[in-house]
A protein has these predicted regions:
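Polar/charged, compositionally biased leader and regulatory segments
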Residues: 1-57, 172-215
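Extracytoplasmic
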Residues: 12, 31, 39-40, 48-50, ...
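Short, glycine/small-residue-enriched coil/turn segments at secondary-structure junctions
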Residues: 38-46, 61-93
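A residue-level detector for short acidic-glycine micro-motifs
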Residues: 55, 74, 90, 116-119, ...
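Solvent-exposed coil/turn segments that connect beta secondary-structure elements
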Residues: 58, 75-77, 85, 93, ...
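Zn2+-dependent peptidoglycan hydrolase active-site motif and core
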Residues: 65-68, 82-121
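Surface-exposed strand-loop junctions at beta-sheet edges and helix termini
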Residues: 74, 83, 122-123, 128
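Conserved, short, structured surface segments that act as functional micro-motifs
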Residues: 100-106, 126-183, 187
Length: 215
């Protein structure tokens, strides 16, 4: 039996397309109930850049934080395109993270995030089509070199883009992606690891001279 606060499944009509529209945060859905499952149409997907995946989605033990998207290779000035048709919700700059970035809102609670632009090519509330240029690649914000940080979010939850898209082929793995809340929670939860410093001091050995036994 489902818990009261959880819906069994949602459709496009269940998500308010204007929810949190004026919220400046990337995740503006913190007050929304997350359904157990949802079917998301991703058939329109277009590669934002023709680059390879240089860093995947997941927990980074070295930095002790989640990487909530993937990084795609590009050169500064390369055109970055909208992955799906939608409306521009955020055009902003974040020095300690995304740098120059854009958030696009799509159907049914889906949003995409594009980070580290050298230049924005769209304005807030602009309607864009899949494949339309939205920015130029760069290395602004927390970045060690030119690349595109790309996220696919559902109701604010950062999904694994590589579970939805085959980035080698540049096409969605399935036209309809099924979101599963329990699977997401298990996948996105970092493994509990012990980061306390281990005692690396070598054990003291007994180097005392042994008595020679007379023959």
């Amino acid at each position: 039996m489902l818990e009261k606060e959880e819906k069994e499944e949602v459709t496009i009509t269940d998500v308010d397309c204007m929810h949190g529209w004026n919220n400046p945060r990337v995740n503006c859905y913190t007050d929304v109930e997350i359904p157990l499952t949802a079917k998301l149409d991703v058939s329109e997907f277009t590669m934002p850049v023709n680059g390879r995946v240089t860093s995947g989605y997941g927990y980074r033990p070295k930095f002790r934080r989640m990487h909530r998207g993937i990084d795609l290779s590009l050169k500064t000035g390369d055109t970055v395109r909208a992955a799906f048709s939608g409306i521009v919700r955020i055009v902003s700059y974040e020095g300690g993270g995304y740098g120059n970035y854009v958030v696009l809102r799509h159907d049914n609670g889906v949003e995409t995030v594009y980070g580290h632009f050298s230049k924005h090519l769209v304005k807030r509330e602009q309607i864009v089509s899949a494949g339309q240029p939205i920015g130029l690649g760069g290395s602004t914000g927390r970045s060690t070199g030119p690349h595109l940080h790309f996220e696919i979010r559902y109701l604010g939850l950062a999904l694994n883009p590589s579970a939805i898209v085959d980035f080698n082929e540049g096409t969605p793995k399935q036209n309809i992606y099924t979101f599963n809340k329990k699977t997401y929670q298990n996948y996105s939860k970092p493994q509990q690891q012990n980061y306390s410093r281990k005692n690396t001091k070598p054990q003291r050995k007994n180097y005392s001279k042994k008595k020679k036994i007379a023959s």
